[in-house]
Amino acid sequence: MSYAELFCQSNFSFLTGASHAEELVLQAAFYRYQAIAITDECSVAGVVKAHATIEQHKLDIKQIVGSMFWLNDECQVVLLCPCRKAYAELCRIITNARRRSEKGSYQLSEWDLMSVRHCFVLWLPTHQESDHYWGRWLQQHHAHRLWVAIQRHLGGDDDAYTTHCELLANEFQLPIAACGGVLMHAVERLPLQHVLTAVKHGCSVDKLGFSRLSNAERALRPLNKLSRIYKSKWLEESTHIADLCEFKLSDLKYEYPTELIPNGYTPTSYLRMLVERGKKLRFPEGIPADIHQTIENELALIEELEYHYYFLTIHDIVMFAKQQGILYQGRGSAANSVVCYCLEITAVDPRQISVLFERFISREREEPPDIDVDFEHERREEVIQYIYKKYGRERAALAATVISYRFKSAVREVGKALGIEETQLDFFIKNVNRRDRTQGWQAQIIELGLQPESLKGQQFIQLVNEITGFPRHLSQHVGGFVISSGPLYELVPVENASMEDRTIIQWDKDDLESLKLLKVDVLALGMLNAIRKCFQLVEKHHQRSLSIAEITRLQDDPHVYRMIQKADTVGVFQIESRAQMSMLPRLKPARYYDLVVQIAIARPGPIQGDMVHPFLKRRNGEEPISYPSEEVKSVLERTMGVPIFQEQVIKLAMVAAGFSGGEADQLRRAMAAWKKNGDLAKFKPKLIDGMRERGYDLEFAERIFDQICGFGEYGFPESHSASFAVLAYCSAWLKFYYPAEFYTALLNSQPMGFYSPSQLIQDARRHGVEVLPVCINHSSYQHHLVQRPNGRLGVQLGFRLVKGFNQESASRLVERRPSTGYRAIQEVKQILRNRRDIELLASADAFQILSGNRYNARWAAMDSLSDLPLFNHIEEPMANYQAQPSEYENLIEDYASTGLSLSRHPITLLEEAGKLPRFTRMKQLVEKEHNSLVTVIGVVTGRQSPGTAAGVTFFTLEDDTGNINVVVWRATARAQKQAYLTSKVLMVKGILEREGEVTHVIAGKLIDCTHNLAELKSKSRDFH
């Protein structure tokens, strides 16, 4: 016998399906089903994953595309796609049902179902009286494409339900097909299905009642079992339906938008015209012969693969941004393209890096190139709305991002479903160190009190493992647009995003890549926003017009690089993390390409591939540089014989092992997926044999393969690093020459980067920039620059810093502020008329100029007499109550209301109060000997744990003289977990290490001192 499963829901039927689509097709193929239909509820979100699994494993099973719907909560149907027209119809129905409802739900109308002309309809009677009405209604509209689908789950009413369905089939002269109503690939997933149902109903599994599946019969079942449950003719009908379904997802063909081509041009001639025009702009001194040849090669390949429209689409988008004054920068593999450089998509001169066009486009890949373009994060919405306006909502939508269960959400949801107390779950979540790779979370939770021998404890661990990675809902991609020539909803369903004026498709970037469909990445980058704002401030206060291009055209500035070499890079793009800062004094960047290397080398890939130490030794002249051949030298000479970039690995495979460009790109993809599936192993024989055949010794070949494995999924492309290095240098240059403008721009672009406003302000003050507190008479919503008596510019903090105080209230306050300023809080109250806003400003001490202190301001805010019209214009003298806030109280309130304080540092106050032992301040560390024992204390402002094999965590402690870099090894973290994970004020006893002017402390003992400053509302940026 044979069978086709026609009704099967994956975990993209959120909180219902208990298996991945991949698991379902693998299990169905194992059972030798003829076909399987992935039919999630009003969704095709799981179908591409099933398709990709069948293709990858070459499974002998047919996939049918479909979806299940409820109409009026009474009529349940499954729509299947026998042909391409049926698929377009299904996508339209899903789109309509989703678009007329809130995100996460759908509303199917009778018209939607009546309009079906091509889809097959499986009707699943509900065993209610209304079945007779819906049977008649469906038979009237879909007589020749309608089946009664019978599910048998071996429940108590199975026989009665089957008889009911047979009577309905006879009544309406409809054929019957067997189907399973499958929710899981194996019976072992039943407990997880119960948990999902409990999460859906907001209760524990014990309280589900009749909502809980009574058995595991909604798993895929072997054929011999199905033959005992269903009549043979019903099973045969399932395969008959499957035979009629000829549509395959591989039939989908992407059609590029065509309206960008002016009259008189072909796509080829128009692209060439734009490139010719652009290369004169990019190379005003003349086109080098090798660049000219590269352009011709690229254009020929673009024409051969018919990617003209893709490049023209990206060019159109970036030209819109340029015309609107929106900063942008193309990055990633696009920087390997000289055509992209000529089209002004990317900013990296191809002569500055080693261009590898195969990284961008190759014949063997048979897929469109991937161009990432970053725009200012505050103005990206203008670009997004331009795309919607140009192509219409019918033809453009954002790709989806699948939001999945991760450790915290998995622990919380599974625990609640099993009836574990929320306080215990919070304790688990807070105290498990997920970055400890040598001790899994299971062992840590057992140490924290979970009973592993209990049934509930065993279920908890099993179910958390199973649900981790399950999709929770679809969100919008950070900027991946899909733009089509015709209606997009005929290619993939479109639904509402949570954000207003946004729509998303039901597929993510991996799905699009699997089907070789175009995605245009319109991404947001905070640093571009900060740079533009800095340019504006420089022009306003210094009448100097700057641009990224102008700064990068300047010769490498030794003053800027000296600042970088000292790791004075707080706020500088890409080189501000503790991992980067620890590397800067060792690598000592002195030119642009050094920055390219710096950005890439402080990554897990080069570290795990053991490439960092050899590179540094060779750079410092401590190790000779040698190459086994001229071909290898041509690839590795720029990085002193050590592979640092992805492109170098790809080129090595080509020149040393004989890989074609496409084969080398397949190697790159395998590297990207190395941690998931270990597919790199299949390349080892070809790589080793290819090198041996070309005269390289086995040791060299093995070392190259080991380095490739070390890169794993962390390899960093040179093209990516080159694009980032432009912004890194630009931001460092601005920090050195225009510090007040730089910090103001950064503060006005928050949230972004590694550092909080408090840390940025502390760094600004250390660089001699005066910072003024929020003031009712001098602040605007944004932070701005003011001329100080010493002739220098200072930063006036803005109302945006006050937690809970909105821009509308701030704007009203500034617009109506008298030229001489407010004279009394009562004037402000008449403008804001919102006691909460007044209290927020009082808490932030914004009224100090009027009231003397925040206590007086609060009294004035609570004074109801002055709210009466008769007393509006009475100017009372500044109150001088005896109760004055202490310096400590002011500090606590500063942090609570604005997240920072301009008064004395918490560490200073704690020391004066006698709450701290003797310790060494950051500024005193330079006086200490290398390898000496020190004790440091500071407020924890950051914990960073790069994905390196060493298991290091970099702590940043802030004392009253600066930031202290602390290195915590895995063993130390594990032995002192509480202080490691939760402390706000931390004492560290350890060994001082110094490299030039840069110091860090290797932690030995961690002591939590938070109790000394328990009320402090400081926040650290942890593990980002």
Swiss-Prot record:
Keyword Nucleotidyltransferase part of the UniProt annotation: yes
Lipid biosynthesis keyword on record: no
EC annotation from Swiss-Prot or TrEMBL: 2.7.7.7
A biological process term (GO) from this entry: DNA repair
Keyword field: Cytoplasm, DNA damage, DNA repair, DNA replication, DNA-directed DNA polymerase, Nucleotidyltransferase, Transferase
One function term, GO molecular function aspect: 3'-5' exonuclease activity
Pfam families assigned: DNA_pol3_alpha, DNA_pol3_finger, HHH_6, PHP, tRNA_anti-codon
Name of the top EC class for this enzyme: transferase
GO cellular component: cytoplasm
HAMAP family registered for this protein in UniProt: DNApol_error_prone
Family: Belongs to the DNA polymerase type-C family. DnaE2 subfamily.
Physiological role: DNA polymerase involved in damage-induced mutagenesis and translesion synthesis (TLS). It is not the major replicative DNA polymerase.
UniProt-listed PANTHER family: DNA POLYMERASE III SUBUNIT ALPHA (PTHR32294), ERROR-PRONE DNA POLYMERASE (PTHR32294:SF4)
Protein name, as recorded: Error-prone DNA polymerase
Gene: dnaE2
